[in-house]
Amino acid sequence: MDMKTAEILCNVTSDFYRAQAASFSATRASPWHGWRRCVAAMAEALGVVGCVEGESVHGEATPDGGAGESARCAADAGVRPGVSVFDLACGNLRFERYLVEALPHADVRAYAIDSCDELAADAGGLEIPVTYESSDIVGGLIAGAPLHELHHAPQVDMAVSFGFLHHVPGEELRVRVLDGLIDAVRPGGCVAVSLWQFMNNPTLAAKACVTHAQAGEALGLAADAFDEGDYLLGWKNVEGAWRYCHHFSDEEVDRLIDAVSSRARLVDTFEADGRMGAMNKYLVLQKVR
């Protein structure tokens, strides 16, 4: 994809979120099912206690049904490890609210970044300290800046990005985001991302084909301006409410993992979310250097 097209798609998506922030946020109140396993996998890799409902890296409950023996001992001793989290494209900060129940025996501090202040303003009810920063991540990447130049968060224990990578146009930029998330964590720190596979759902796939054709014509974008897996999706039948989204094939997921394999090891990968439990592919990585 050429950078001119990428800029257009970036602007279309930014305009969508600013205009539809309230209605979009209203549909994003509950945690995604995949988050539970992501946090459990990262906590286990980091040796952090307090995984939600005692899940192990593979989502299996500990024998006591709680957070495991180490969590109980830590809680009894009054030990609360500090855990720092970087959330790229935080939206309405619902992941930060989820962390309170996911890591009940840890002192969590979050650094959150998004380009849509209207979404973040709808947060409220936060029980952990959160430093929020407004930044046009995709626009900065298109301009050539590395991710670490687009925010001011310190290196953290965990870096996550959920529901964002499918808005990043072009495989090269998506690799740069994943690289930047690895940069954001300390040595041994963990990264978790979700990769949307919406075209595996026949209903969503049919809608995507219709809205993509309509939006492409309205925006004057030829079919060959897009990469394979690229679509312009609608929103609640609102006229002109389009956002750029990329469907991740299994082959591209493998390429993403390979692209960062010298810097991070794959801790876990799985599918979750949606009615069939397979709307998102998740990757959990641990930084080795």
Give the positions of each predicted feature.
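Class I (Rossmann-like) S-adenosyl-L-methionine-dependent methyltransferase catalytic domain
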Residues: 1-58, 64-149, 172, 190-289
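Local beta-strand N-terminus motif with an aromatic residue
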Residues: 82, 155-156
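Structural motif
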Residues: 148-151, 183
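A conserved beta-strand element that flanks and buttresses the S-adenosyl-L-methionine
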Residues: 160
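Short catalytic micro-motifs in class I SAM-dependent methyltransferases
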Residues: 163-167
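A short, conserved alpha-helix within the catalytic core of class I
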Residues: 168-180
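Conserved helix-to-beta-strand junction in the class I
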Residues: 180-187
